Curated annotation (Swiss-Prot):
Protein known as: tRNA(Met) cytidine acetate ligase
Source organism of the structure: Lysinibacillus sphaericus (strain C3-41)
NCBIfam families the UniProt entry points to: PRK13670.1
Compartment list: Cytoplasm
Classification via InterPro entries: Rossmann-like_a/b/a_fold, tRNA(Met)_cyd_acetate_ligase
Record keywords, A-Z: ATP-binding, Cytoplasm, Ligase, Nucleotide-binding, RNA-binding, tRNA processing, tRNA-binding
Lineage: Bacteria, Bacillati, Bacillota, Bacilli, Bacillales
GO molecular function, one term: ATP binding
Role according to the record: Catalyzes the formation of N(4)-acetylcytidine (ac(4)C) at the wobble position of elongator tRNA(Met), using acetate and ATP as substrates. First activates an acetate ion to form acetyladenylate (Ac-AMP) and then transfers the acetyl group to tRNA to form ac(4)C34.
Annotated GO CC locations: cytoplasm
Keyword tRNA processing part of the UniProt annotation: yes
Recorded family membership: Belongs to the TmcAL family.
GO BP annotations, alphabetical order: tRNA modification
Amino acids binding ATP: 7-20, 101, 164, 189-190
Length: 403
């Protein structure tokens, strides 16, 4: 059986995602689709709007055959490590290819871009350092260095100002760095851009647009036409039970408490928290009544919103720099769900899979997995605050979902 891999967050699963996985399967001429999906906390440093199990159900209903969790260590990391973790897992599970969405759907500009940077690495790194010295943020410095090289060596390259192109580049980079035989493929994105708001006449919207619409109206009807019926039903069921979708705003009381129980110097223990920002974080926490006002007090030219959110995520979950440095690569494959075809694939390929395949978490003993379970427990704690409805599934007790 031929498998194509995709890297996803499904926050939530929408019509654009359904198109992407259908096209990925078609272009790859694959029998099954394997998705590596972030768990409870995501790459932009924020909690998923619904838990990993609900999103797994959405994925299986939408046509994914196997859903594997991207460990917290990678799901909350900068793009380079996020991609490395995901591509490592897709390679280990035996995918022949991986597919990602991009602005124009052509793989050659991605290959050109990788070669440009790889062949001029010394100059590229020097340009980044020069830009950082001016006080520019790291993402802006990367883009500056890239622009300088593209002007010096003209060719068809990708636009690295586009979020999906950035991730696509890092997926390709990870595959090359890992010396993986997995083949890169790209699918053109349709209609909605990453940050676009919902449009009344369109059935396609970005996940960001959907979350913003729900945050501003609290009406599920506003997003009904841009998500599959099954996703809409799962979102409706979630909201009926928990009265909210997860966000840092809804987590704010517990997040504020977590920050304030530390001293400023203690905050620097946590992953990505750079010395110099700890006092600003503490001062903002003490003087803010909401997450948004907290963030507005900290963000600056040097620290992007996303970078600060990742720091905050690690403070909230207690994930330290020491822990981060102790991991070099994914150490297991956590199975979240599978279709009948997915189960058949695993049955045939199980002996060839390069990492331990975990379906019964309670029987496993792995330091990286323990971090995932702890993050899920803290996520559940915030969701269940003030709610008398049924409890969320206990992460270490929940078996893979079968569809």
């Amino acid at each position: 059986m031929k498998a194509v891999g995709i890297v996803v967050e499904y926050n939530p699963f929408h019509n654009g995602h359904a198109y992407h996985l259908t096209q990925a399967k078609k272009v790859a001429k694959a029998d099954i689709v394997i998705a590596v999906m972030s768990g409870t906390f995501l790459q932009r440093g924020e909690p998923a709007m619904v838990d990993k199990w609900t999103r797994t159900k959405m994925a299986l209903a939408g046509g994914v055959d196997i859903v594997i969790e991207l460990p917290y260590v990678y799901s909350t990391a900068p793009a380079t490590d996020f991609a490395k973790g995901a591509i490592s897992i897709l390679t280990a599970v035996g995918c022949d290819s991986f597919a990602f969405g991009s602005e124009d759907g052509s793989i050659q500009p991605f290959l050109n871009t990788y070669d440009l940077i790889d062949n001029n690495r010394t100059e590229y790194d020097a340009l980044i350092k020069d830009s950082l010295k001016t006080g520019a943020s790291y993402p802006k410095s990367l883009y500056y260095a890239y622009e300088q090289l593209t002007q010096k060596f003209p060719a068809p390259y990708i636009d690295l100002a586009q979020p999906n192109n950035i991730l696509g580049f890092h997926y390709l980079e990870a595959a090359r760095t890992l010396d993986s035989n997995i083949k890169p493929l790209t699918i053109p994105r349709i209609a909605a851009g990453y940050h676009d708001a919902l449009k009344q006449d369109s059935s396609i919207a970005s996940a960001t647009g959907i979350r913003k619409a729900l945050a501003s109206t609290s009406s599920l009807q506003s997003v009904q036409k841009v998500v599959p019926e099954t996703s809409f039903d799962y979102l409706t069921d979630w909201h009926r039970h928990y009265k909210k979708f997860a966000s840092w705003e809804s987590f704010w009381p517990l997040l504020q408490f977590t920050i304030m129980r530390h001293t400023p110097s203690e905050l620097t223990r946590y992953a990505e928290v750079t010395e110099g920002i700890e006092n600003a974080i503490m001062k903002a926490a003490k003087n803010s009544s909401s997450f948004n006002s907290f963030m507005e007090k900290i963000k600056s030219k040097r620290y992007t919103w996303t970078r600060i959110q990742r720091m905050i995520t690690h403070i909230y979950t207690g994930f330290t720099k020491e822990q981060l440095q102790s991991f070099e690569a994914p150490s297991f494959i956590r199975l979240l769900g599978m279709s009948a075809k997915g189960q058949a694939y695993l049955g045939k390929r199980k002996k060839d899979i390069e990492l331990p395949l975990i379906s019964r978490v309670a029987a496993a003993n792995d330091a990286m997995l323990a971090i995932d379970i702890h993050a899920a427990e803290l996520y559940n704690l915030s969701i269940e605050q003030g709610v008398t409805a049924q409890s969320l599934p206990k992460d270490y007790q929940t078996p893979p979902i079968r569809n």
